[in-house]
Amino acid sequence: MNMNKYIDHTLLKPDATQEMIDKLCQEAREHDFMSVCVNPYWVKRSAELLAGSDVKVCTVIGFPLGASTIESKAAETRDAIANGATEVDMVLNVGALKSGDLETVKKDIAAVKQAAGDILLKVILETCLLTEEEKVVACKLSVEAGADYVKTSTGFSTGGATVEDIALMRKTVGPNVGVKASGGVRDGETAVAMIEAGASRIGTSSGVSIVTGAKTTGSGY
């Protein structure tokens, strides 16, 4: 298993500095990770640092609450792509979902997909806030709206990825849509368990320690 190609090497802390972003990109190049995942402000620098490599530049949209408007999420997506983003992870409108406003949830995702075009779109469900039924509904709406991936968590709420949620999401979306585990994946054992449950991507700040087998001090995003 080439674990490095499962990893979105992630740094989304609000106090991330330029030095920390530079180190993230250097590590991603060194270990040939699938992507770096950074806040929109750092997309342009990350794209410049990773130019000529295979490492993709992923950013987050409507992050971390998902409660911004459809229009603002679409605009944020266009801006991120203009700055060099090659993947986007948007946060689902959790409040709309829990209110039963499924039309808004779907329109929200579809608007970001339209803005993203051919850019890979992952939809963050924030599974720790959802019932089992809501997780299934969220997966189905994401697929219907054109998402390429569904993703467990922002890493900023009450919980992260679980093997059970990954298995449920994989079962719901089928074999042709990606599933990303994020939040609390801090070691190789956990990463392998997520992959065996159906994850096709791992979002973590502990990517280096996962691929090298070292003990981690990462946040486990």
Swiss-Prot record:
Keyword Oxidoreductase on entry: no
Catalytic activity: 2-deoxy-D-ribose 5-phosphate = D-glyceraldehyde 3-phosphate + acetaldehyde
Family annotation (InterPro entries): Aldolase_TIM, DeoC, DeoC/FbaB/LacD_aldolase, DeoC_typeI
Class in the EC hierarchy, top level: lyase
Keyword Lyase part of the UniProt annotation: yes
Active site, UniProt feature: 89, 151, 180
An annotated Gene Ontology molecular function: deoxyribose-phosphate aldolase activity
Coiled coil region boundaries: none
Main location per the UniProt record: cytoplasm
Subcellular location: Cytoplasm
SUPFAM superfamilies from the UniProt entry: Aldolase
Keywords: Cytoplasm, Lyase, Schiff base
Pathway info: Carbohydrate degradation; 2-deoxy-D-ribose 1-phosphate degradation; D-glyceraldehyde 3-phosphate and acetaldehyde from 2-deoxy-alpha-D-ribose 1-phosphate: step 2/2
Alphabetical GO biological process terms: 2-deoxyribose 1-phosphate catabolic process; carbohydrate catabolic process; deoxyribonucleotide catabolic process
EC number annotated for this UniProt entry: 4.1.2.4
GO terms for cellular component: cytoplasm
HAMAP family membership: DeoC_type1
UniProt cross-references to PANTHER family, sorted A to Z: DEOXYRIBOSE-PHOSPHATE ALDOLASE (PTHR10889:SF1)
Function summary: Catalyzes a reversible aldol reaction between acetaldehyde and D-glyceraldehyde 3-phosphate to generate 2-deoxy-D-ribose 5-phosphate.
Record-given protein name: Deoxyribose-phosphate aldolase
Gene behind this protein: deoC
